[in-house]
Amino acid sequence: MEKRSFLVILLFMVLNLAGISQSKSFYDFKVKTLEGEDFDLASLKGKKVMVVNTASKCGFTPQYKDLEALYEQYKDVLVIIGFPANNFLHQEPGTASEIRNFCTTNYGVTFPMMAKISVKGSDMHPLYKWLTSKKENGVKDSSVKWNFQKYLIDENGKLVNVVYSSEKPNSDKILSWITSK
């Protein structure tokens, strides 16, 4: 009887741990566009995705130009998603319409831009909690250091790498990732 109870408890523990260790996928999230529409990340299955926290008044803001060029060149295999955030020195103070106008007028941005969110702190958006926590993404812990940090997601919705702001969108590292099979 004791042996049977032990086996039942052991089986319960194993099944419970298996459930805990399963990571969510990038595709499990839904976000809002700058226009307030729902955007289901599952619609991006089969493509690589670069998630970038953006800001209009940052030294890295000119990266919008390279991000747009990359998006235009590789849009068959890559989607870039911008998430405006005001977490660093209040460098994204604009409203949704101001952000859209800024991105379109100054950089011709056509890649998807999402609603302004928080990428750190107690009000961090759930997607960024997933991106920054190994416990959630199953790959690595990171923290968002500054605007224009890039999270690379593979075609299966798994986090692959984090690329910091100083790395340009068209760097060899990023281009190699995009073109790899």
Language model: regions and residue ranges:
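Bacterial Sec-dependent N-terminal signal peptides
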Residues: 1-24
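Amphipathic alpha-helical repeat scaffolds
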Residues: 33, 53-57
